[in-house]
Structures are given as C-alpha cells and as structure tokens.
Amino acid sequence: MNIWLNMLTTTGLGAIIGGYTNHLAIKMLFRPHRPIYIGKFQVPFTPGLIPKRRDELAVQLGKMVVEHLLTPEGIGKKLTNEEFQKGLIHWAQVEVDKVITNEQSLRHMLEKWNVAHVEEEATRKIEHVITEKIHAFLAEYYTYTWEQALPHSVNEKVENAIPNVSAFILERGISFFESEEGKARLSKMIDDFFASRGTLLNLVGMFLGNVSVVDRVQPEVIKFLGQDATKQLLTDVLQKEWEKLKGRDVKELEAFVEKEMIVSSVLSAVKVEETVSKFLNQSVQQVCEPVRETIIEKVVPSAVAKGLKWGTENVESILNNLHLAEIVQQEVSTFSTERLEDLVLSITKNELKMITYLGALLGGMIGLVQGLLLLFLR
C-alpha cells in the first residue's frame, strides 16, 4: 500500500511541478509587464520576454510582413489571377451601377461628395474655355483672307447663289416699281432730277408734264429690270464684289465688330449658366442612362484591367513607397503590453495549453520513473 502511495505521490508531484513550470514559463513571456526593483537591484527576468523585447518584436514583425507575407511576387500573382480579376470586375460593375442609377440629382450627389460651388465653378470654367477658344480662333483667322478662311463648300454655295440673288433683287425691284409706292418714288426722283438740272430742264419738264414723264419712264424701268442682260450685268457686278471680298483680310472685321462683342454674343447665345444649371438638376440616372451599358460592359472592365496591369507592373514600387515594415512597426509599438499579450494568446491559446499539459505529462512520467527507481532500490 505504501509503495503505491509513494508512486502516486511522486507521479502527482512530478505532474504538478512539470505543468506549473511550463505554465510559469509561458506566463513569464508576458509577465511582469514592467521591471521590478528591490532597492536599486532589478529582479531577474523582469519585465517578461515580450514586454522587454517589444520594440525588437515590432521591427521583426514588420520585416516578416514585407519579406515573407506581402511580397511583390505574392501580390503580383494575386493580381494576375483570372478568378480574382473576374471577381473584382464584377464587384466594380455592381458598385458603379449603383452610382450611375442613383435617382438623386447630380447637384445633390456632388454636394454629398463635398464638391462645393460646382455650378459656379463649372460655369466659370466653361465660359473661360469658350472665351479662350474664340480668341484662339480669331487670332488664327485674322491672319487669313476671306477666301482662305471660308470652307470651299461655302465659297461654292455663294458663287452658285449669286445668279439667284441677282434674279431675286430684280424681281423685287420690278414688284416695287409696279406698285403705287414705287411709282410715287419714281415720280419724286424725276422731280428731283429736273430740279437739280437747272432752268432749261425745268422748262422741258413743265412742258412734258410730270405725270406724262412718269408714265413713260416706269414701263422702261420695269422693262430694263426684266431683261436678261440686266440680270447678267447685276450677276457680274455681284461676282466682282464677291471676288474683292474674298481677297480682303478677315482682320478688317475687327473695325466693325470687337472681339469682346463676339465673345459676349456667343456666350449669350450658348447660355452657359442656364445649361449647367439644367444639367446639374438632372438625376444621375438621367445623365448616365444613354451611356450606362457602355460604362458597365466596356469602360469598367477596361479600367479594372488597366488598373490591375499597372498595379502588377508597379507592385514593388508601390510596396516600397507604402513602407509597410514601418507601418507594422509603428502599429505594434503603439500596442499596450496587455493588448499584445491578448493578441498572441488569441492565436496560440490552444497550443500553449497543450504545452502546459505536456509539461504535466512529462513531469508525471518522471515522477513515475522516480517512484519505480525507489521501489527497485529498496
């Protein structure tokens, strides 16, 4: 009975000592959190291993992340993975579609994104661009003649239209002189003509009688205007004037119309502020609906593919510029010792328990062996 009690005692004590020793060793990894002093003498093994080496641990964790976890090769492989790319494109399509089908006004959406004074800025910038374009256009075209400035098609149309213009002018002239107003105007012109030519022609006019002269002149004027030769004459005159105009510099226009007046007229016709306001008051869905399918099916996949390609080609540079090792080091350095302990224990809790149990098992086995040795040595 005493033999079995001795063996049980040695085994139990060995298990307790082994288990507690391992448990204490594990605790000493983290505890105490601060050094303990007796007078000026620092107690050995204080603070615990991890609190004492926390800065070194932070540096090593940073190196481990950069050198073994988030490597350029690993990230590059992930970025070129076909399944990952498909998933990312699908996610991007869903998220973009949510934005472009939003029924909120474009103005409200921009304000939500903290884009302030967008209407004023857009109006100002558009007007500035239009003004700059007009000035650039005029600066270029003021160096041309009208023949150089006008498109060939316009020149052709004007030349083809000259005979029709001549015919129109003559038709209007005939209609005018056939009317009572035209006859009255012609009568006045005859009176003025005789009055300006002196006494002799005045006497002739009085002798012929005014009404008689008008009645004789009116048909001749109408007949003259209706002749083909007159039409050809007017066409030739207009053609010559058109040729003269084509040879003149566009810059001469500046003497009649100032640049700022042209700019002001264009801006007034375009109504930039009103157009921008109407555009911003539309819903995002209304604005994007005409191009929604193109954005979702073409733009998004293309943008994601190009982004991933760029990311793959520049992943090493990106990681270097991110300084991940420093980020990890700084973050770990800010952890309290308690948090660091909880973090390690949350990962290794089961394993550390098994180490404690293993210590108890080994201690128990050693105690059993000791009990057996004592039994045989008696």
Swiss-Prot record:
Q: Where are the transmembrane segments?
A: 357-377
Q: Does the record's keyword annotation contain Cell membrane?
A: yes
- Name one cellular component (GO) term: plasma membrane
The record describes its membrane topology as:
Single-pass membrane protein
**Which Pfam families does the UniProt record give?**
DUF445
Localization annotation: Cell membrane
Q: Which InterPro entries match?
A: DUF445, UCP032178
Record keywords: Cell membrane included? yes
Keywords, alphabetical = Cell membrane, Membrane, Transmembrane, Transmembrane helix
Q: Where does it mainly reside?
A: membrane
Similarity remark: Belongs to the UPF0754 family.
The identity of this protein, by name, is UPF0754 membrane protein BC_0879
Organism lineage: Bacteria, Bacillati, Bacillota, Bacilli, Bacillales
